[in-house]
Regions:
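Anion-binding and metal-coordination hotspots
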Residues: 1-278
Length: 278
């Protein structure tokens, strides 16, 4: 690669269909009322670790703080939820398992923690066979960013002679025979609580409206950049130069957006309304 600041990533434009890695940057757009109000660019191959630095630097430069943070499933993590809570903001983040959790395969998977009954008072799960999975231990897991998450490990006392064992216990690469294995999993109580609260918000009327507008406005800014402006590759090298180029492009997007909104008499509109079915 010719840019030492870039990172090899898998691109959506994969003509050979072989998952070829190309040097690239992770560009993040913060959009409000269809205008790009803030952007960052970095070498992170995934979106999860970009949210907190994005919000921090945006709040340092702006004179106000956004109350509601709307993001896609790629930004969901306990660390991001916790930061938004501590920052007195409200998260509208689509859970990573939101789409798959609606499938029949997911709902019928008896080995998933989501399909087990939880007794909050006594802190144990009950599996399909009626056996209890009790708390075995607690461990602290540290992420690459330094965030520490408390994981609770639950285990079943006895899984012998269980008719649901093959469907419940996963992991075919284990050296221990299935007959000798017991059901065990780890989970974060804090993350489970955060995801549950967030799910209630995103399926509400307000949540649906904000999620639809995120898809239209945030994804739309990249669609206009790539499709309408035919911008596919940065002309500069080095992260600072690429950032400057991205800012110029965002300014051009905003000018075009303002012109189109004036022509369509939509300058006072901040959100697209949901289409109502009969």
């Amino acid at each position: 690669k010719t840019d030492v600041d870039a990172t090899f990533m898998r691109m959506k434009e994969d003509a050979m269909k072989n998952g070829q890695l190309k040097p690239a940057y992770n560009l993040q757009h913060g959009v409000d009322s269809e205008y790009v109000v803030w952007l960052t660019i970095g070498p992170q191959p995934t979106d999860t670790t970009t949210l907190i630095p994005f919000l921090k630097i945006m709040e340092e430069r702006l004179k106000f703080k956004y109350l509601k943070i709307v993001a896609d499933a790629g930004y969901e993590s306990e660390e991001n939820y916790s930061f938004i809570e501590e920052n007195n903001q409200i998260a509208f983040i689509k859970p990573a398992n939101y789409e798959i959790s609606k499938t029949r395969k997911f709902k019928n998977d008896i080995g998933k923690i989501e399909n087990m009954e939880y007794n909050e008072a006594k802190d144990f799960y009950t599996c399909r066979s009626g056996k209890q999975l009790k708390k075995e231990s607690i461990k602290i897991k540290k992420s690459k960013t330094g965030y520490e998450s408390e994981k609770t490990i639950y285990a079943c006392e006895d899984c012998s002679n269980c008719s649901c064992k093959i469907s419940c216990i996963k992991g075919n690469n284990s050296k221990i025979p299935i007959e000798q294995r017991t059901k065990k999993f780890e989970t974060s109580k804090k993350f489970n609580r955060q995801r549950k609260d967030d799910l209630e918000r995103i399926v509400s009327d307000e949540g649906c409206l904000l999620r639809v507008n995120r898809s239209i406005q945030a994804e739309g800014s990249f669609a206009q950049l790539k499709q309408d402006m035919d911008f596919r590759r940065f002309m500069c090298r080095g992260q600072n130069n690429v950032l400057a180029e991205s800012i110029l492009l965002a300014m051009a997007l905003n000018i075009n957006k303002l012109h189109r909104k004036i022509q369509a008499n939509r300058t006072g509109k901040h959100l697209f309304e949901l289409k109502k079915t009969a």
